[in-house]
Amino acid sequence: MKNQGIFENVRETLPPIISRDHVSEILGGVISTKTLANLDSEGKGPKRMRIGRKIVYRTEDLLEWLATRTIILN
């Protein structure tokens, strides 16, 4: 992925799995919990898993998904 490099430093500091409830907090508000839930319901979000009642994302999948939607502006 062409934008993958911008997330390399972030990847090293995150846990391997992130709950949907914490994505916004961990990524500095880049995407809200509600927006992520809506994208998931439309099949447009990152790959997800359910652990108990929580929706979670592998950090690798989440960052890969973000990289495909990132446009670097000059």
For every predicted segment, state its role.
Residues H22, D61-L62:
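Short, well-ordered alpha-helical scaffold segment located
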Residues L62-N74:
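A short, Lys/Arg-enriched interface patch at domain edges and termini
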Residues I26-V56:
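Major-groove DNA-recognition helix of helix-turn-helix-type DNA-binding domains
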Residues T13, R50-G52, V56, E60, ...:
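Small/flexible residues
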